[in-house]
């Protein structure tokens, strides 16, 4: 089998498995199996692959045909121009979440302390620290396995993050100028209807936001006050249909300057608000 034939075979197998971008995935898996790049492929596309390369490529194709996410097979995902290690213990970083990072960067100044709640792979806090100077970063997650991934990503990207295993704010003692969070926000009954890559293979504890999808917003808005400085800012990623509900919850809890920010696709994606210490209401 030549490299060219391998691409065609892979594309056919993945199309039958209803993979949306079958050709691109076939190429990426071939590149991984054979340890080649585009330049090598175009020069050698009609050369025969070794039996070992064929076996490895077929094994990778089988995994993808089972709808295992490509990023879990390859073991990494790009986010904010940086590379992050990923596995089934963490959500795969998505471009939508870059909107949260970009909005946070607009309000973070040198000398500030930033907390990433529900950090997962660590992509949010690590991207913030890579794009700021003299900023202290901390991150929490309830999952020990997720924190292990996040710690590796911090090391690979050359930043220091104070990681803490915590059920939301349970073990958070410090005060922060900015708190960012991409919490679980999918309604429980929606998860089985998501594409298999998400519903079967991504960690449900990082997806499930309870019956209405809003459980973690309520808890974070209520509990963040002990750790968010007066006039500090809280920023959430939200589902595209949750902007009104989350912003109203923040306003009712006494946050000011609450507004919804859209992502590049024009969908509501981030809610941001300022902690007004004069107003203390329970959500």
Where are each of the predicted segments found?
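Non-catalytic accessory regions of SAM-dependent methyltransferases
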Residues: 1-36, 42
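Conserved AdoMet
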Residues: 31-106
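Active-site beta-alpha loop architecture of Rossmann-like, nucleotide-cofactor-dependent enzymes
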Residues: 71, 186-189, 241
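Conserved SAM/SAH cofactor-binding pocket of Class I
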Residues: 95-193, 197, 219
């Amino acid at each position: 089998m030549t490299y060219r034939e391998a691409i065609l075979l892979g594309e056919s197998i993945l199309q039958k498995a209803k993979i949306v971008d079958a050709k691109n995935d076939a190429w990426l898996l071939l590149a991984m199996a054979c340890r080649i790049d585009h330049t090598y492929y175009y020069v050698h596309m009609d050369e025969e692959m070794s039996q070992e390369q064929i076996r490895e490529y077929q094994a990778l194709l089988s995994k993808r045909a089972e709808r295992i996410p490509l990023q879990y097979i390859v073991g990494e995902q790009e986010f904010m121009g940086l590379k992050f290690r990923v596995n089934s213990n963490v959500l795969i970083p998505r471009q939508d979440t870059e909107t949260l990072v970009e909005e946070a960067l607009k309000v973070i100044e040198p000398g500030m302390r930033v907390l990433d709640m529900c950090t997962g792979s660590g992509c949010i806090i690590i991207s913030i620290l890579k794009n700021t100077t003299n900023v202290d970063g901390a991150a929490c997650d309830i999952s020990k396995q997720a924190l292990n991934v996040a710690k590796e990503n911090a090391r690979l990207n050359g930043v220091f993050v104070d990681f803490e295993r915590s059920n939301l704010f349970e073990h958070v003692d410090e005060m922060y100028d900015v708190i960012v969070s991409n919490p679980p926000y999918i309604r429980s009954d929606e998860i089985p209807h998501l594409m298999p890559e998400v519903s079967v293979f991504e960690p449900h504890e990082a997806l499930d936001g309870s019956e209405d999808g809003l459980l973690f917003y309520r808890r974070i808005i209520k509990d963040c006050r002990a750790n968010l400085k007066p006039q500090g800012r809280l920023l959430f990623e939200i589902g595209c249909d949750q902007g009104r509900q989350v912003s109203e919850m923040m306003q009712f809890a006494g946050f000011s300057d609450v507004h919804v920010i859209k992502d590049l696709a024009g969908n509501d994606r981030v809610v941001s608000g300022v902690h007004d210490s004069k107003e203390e209401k329970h959500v």
